[in-house]
A protein has these predicted regions:
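Surface-exposed amphipathic alpha-helical segments
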Residues: 40-44, 97-111, 152-181
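A short acidic-to-branched-hydrophobic micro-motif
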Residues: 60-98, 155-156
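Bacterial Sec-dependent N-terminal signal peptides
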Residues: 1-26, 177
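A short, polar/proline- and glycine-enriched secondary-structure boundary/capping micro-motif
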Residues: 48-49, 56, 87-90, 165-170
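Signature of long, low-cysteine stretches enriched in small and polar/charged residues
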Residues: 35-66, 100-147
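Short N-terminal segments immediately surrounding and downstream of signal-peptide cleavage
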Residues: 23-39
Length: 181
């Protein structure tokens, strides 16, 4: 019995460690539904949020670069939200524009930013939007990608100083995102 407990504990520890797999300096984060690379291990804040649309399961992974760390960006964030199918699904093409507009407006308002640009994008055939916000009256920029995969919204965000916008780490983070089918 004691051996079984040790084996079980070892297995659980190995599974936990595998969810953060380092690649070079970057660390792969995996969920049941996606994977993405962060420059360092992010903080995991997951839970359920009670909203007018019902209880939503939300996973937030974030890494904020310390002032003394040589990183071109200030913060990296992945938010994964699961909506009830009755609220939104990527197959509901007639609802997509309004859903993305409301999502973009929400981030603009939450960050007190100014929308600089937006365009349509996609991942594996699922719809998305790419957005850029001005923050702090020109001092910082937020690059955002929204993807709606069935009833899951993924939001990838990077905040950087305006003079560092367009750096290679932005594309590395954004392009490392993959969904699991």
């Amino acid at each position: 019995m004691k051996t079984l407990k040790i084996i079980t504990a070892s297995f659980l520890l190995a599974c936990a460690m595998l969810s953060f797999v380092p690649v070079g300096e970057w660390i792969m984060i995996t969920t049941n539904n996606c994977k993405i690379y962060f420059p360092k291990k992010p903080t995991d804040r997951s839970g359920t949020v009670n909203t007018a649309k019902g209880n939503l399961k939300v996973n937030i992974y974030s890494y904020q670069a310390a002032a003394n760390v040589s990183d071109d960006n200030l913060a990296y964030i992945l938010t994964e939200t699961e909506y009830p199918d009755s609220v939104i699904n990527s197959d509901d093409e007639d609802k997509l524009d309004i859903f993305f507009k409301n999502s973009i407006d929400g981030i603009v308002n939450n960050f007190h930013g100014t929308l600089l640009s937006q365009s349509k994008t996609a991942i594996d055939g699922f719809p998305g939007r790419q957005v850029k916000l001005d923050l702090q009256q020109g001092k910082a920029v937020m690059n955002i990608r929204f993807y709606l995969v069935k009833n899951r919204m993924y939001i990838l965000e990077i905040i950087t100083n305006t003079n560092k916008d367009g750096n290679a780490a932005i594309e590395k983070f954004m392009n490392s995102f993959e969904i699991k089918n």
